[in-house]
From Swiss-Prot:
This is GTP-binding protein YPT31/YPT8. It is a lipid-anchor. Required for protein transport in the secretory pathway. Probably involved in regulation of secretory vesicle formation at the trans-Golgi compartment. Plays a role in autophagy. It comes from Saccharomyces cerevisiae (strain ATCC 204508 / S288c). The gene is YPT31. Keywords: Acetylation, Autophagy, Golgi apparatus, GTP-binding, Lipoprotein, Membrane, Nucleotide-binding, Prenylation, Protein transport, Transport. GTP binds at residues 20-27, 68-72, 126-129. GO terms for molecular function: GTP binding; GTPase activity.
């Protein structure tokens, strides 16, 4: 029986988290990739929200469930729940703000502490449209990504440059890990929650088996 017989419109569901300092453009990257929208009056995200987009890889429908949260210190309490079950992560910085790039070390460390070692990770230098204000050299970021085995792309949520590429490369990397069994089948059933990568009416695909816990997004006020 196919997934369509159960009312699902996908074969696999991947949980991906966006991390990085507040104001680097995480919310607009999310809305650009999932809805092809950009909000010029973007404000810092309050709480957590997610959006989805479905892609096809090797004839399989992959639904990416992408989570976004604010980067301010006062929201660090949600860290463990936010990362739990994630099979992919994108660390985002603003190419015109060196401090946001310097803090990528912190975000990577926090990810490593809260997620499995096999989680697929990409580094995004956002706001490439502000090249005239560049404070972070591309080569420096490339070197950091190579040293830490991260995917790397510079993007512009404003004009869409490389946004699809960044997300699609990460999703493809996750799919390859699943195909090579670097990510194991857990015991949880897919129910639309945030428990990682899952198959309709079947076991959750996650880096390590996790209990079936329902996660809810709080304060869905993102721009």
């Amino acid at each position: 029986m196919s997934s369509e017989d159960y009312g699902y419109d996908y074969d696999l569901l991947f949980k991906i988290v966006l991390i990085g300092d507040s104001g680097v453009g995480k919310s607009n990257l999310l809305s650009r990739f999932t809805k092809n929208e950009f909000n010029m009056d973007s404000k810092s995200t309050i709480g957590v929200e997610f959006a989805t987009r479905t892609l096809e890889i090797d004839g399989k429908r992959i639904k990416a469930q992408i989570w976004d949260t604010a980067g301010q210190e006062r929201y660090r309490a949600i860290t463990s729940a936010y990362y739990r079950g994630a099979v992919g992560a994108l660390i985002v910085y603003d190419i015109s703000k060196s401090s946001s790039y310097e803090n990528c070390n912190h975000w990577l460390s926090e990810l490593r502490e809260n997620a499995d070692d096999n989680v697929a990770v990409g580094l995004i230098g956002n706001k490439s449209d502000l090249a005239h204000l560049r404070a972070v050299p591309t080569e420096e970021s490339k070197t950091f990504a190579q040293e830490n085995q991260l995917l790397f792309t510079e993007t512009s949520a404003l004009n869409s440059e490389n946004v699809d590429k960044a997300f699609e490369e990460l999703i493809n990397t996750i799919y390859q890990k699943v195909s090579k069994h670097q990510m194991d089948l857990g015991d949880s059933s897919a129910n639309g929650n945030a428990n990682g990568a899952s198959a309709p009416n079947g076991p959750t695909i996650s880096l390590t088996p996790t209990p079936n816990e329902n996660k809810k997004a709080n304060g869905n006020n993102c721009c």
